[in-house]
Amino acid sequence: MSMTRLLCCLVLLLALPLQPACAGLLQDRLEARQLEQAGIRVLRDIAYGNDERQRFDVYLPTSPSRGPAPVIFMVHGGGWANGDKDNGSVALNKALRWVPQGVVLVSTNYRMLPDTPPLAQADDVARALAHAQQLASGWQADPARFVLMGHSAGAHLIALLDAAPEIAAQQGARPWIGSVVLDSAAFNVETVMRGPHLKLYDRAFGEEPTTWRAASPTLRLEQAGAPLLAVCSTRRDDACPQARSFAAKARKLGKRVEVMDVDMSHRQINHKLGRDNGYTTDVEHFLRSVGLLRH
């Protein structure tokens, strides 16, 4: 940042309301300071494709622990049309919580609506996963110990890869050890589209039932695969019923699925994860059970 811009921001701190651009710069500096103090370095905008959205960030311990580190691979939400890997609620709290424990965190972007529909977004996420796994050894991380995590639309994309791992395999990704799905209400897109629903689902999934079925994790699920934790908000009408239906089908296939219903808003489920609270501790029980965190 130039001295002029920094002085501008410091002066504007004395004025109300704070200018949005300046506030963003100050927030970036604050977050960078928090990461530095926690012993975390960040590799920004690693490309896994030619589009400017095909980038991910990597949060690494400044002093790596002994042995290859496990990896959390995080996918942001935003209704398949918005959001970013840099948003504070996506990566910051999670990095501050888990990187000091010896975990590497990857936070990825992907192409979005209106140009890229969810099924192609899942391909992007799978391609990012494959590239992260290929680079993992250079971060002193273990490509065989990835846990996938996503919130909202990102949770749907992670659930889709979990239910249809051939999507990931086609992009060169290796199997992972677990998935954490943070408040998706789109396990069964066909059910959503045949009932009352928000317009964002129309923009994402259109009018073709074949597309609805292809984008439905519950309908695509045919094999056991890695364990999955589905966190759902009891303040929403559809999130927990959708998660339970997915879990019921999974159990018949011998797949381990845990449903964690929480009295939090959709936003809080993402924003509070990584903070020092019982909810984070409960998620960590799952992460330990799949071998990501030490007991």
What does each model-found stretch correspond to?
Residues G24-S65:
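N-terminal cap/lid segment of alpha/beta-hydrolase-fold proteins
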Residues E31-L35, D51, A185, V189-R220:
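Mobile cap/lid helix-loop segments that gate and shape the active-site cleft of serine hydrolases
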Residues P68-G78:
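Short beta-strand element of the alpha/beta-hydrolase
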Residues D86-V106:
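Short amphipathic alpha-helix adjacent to the substrate-entry channel of hydrolases
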Residues T116-A136:
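Alpha/beta-hydrolase active-site loop
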Residues A230-C232:
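Short beta-strand/loop motif that positions the catalytic acidic residue
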Residues D237-R244:
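Conserved alpha/beta-hydrolase "acid-adjacent" motif
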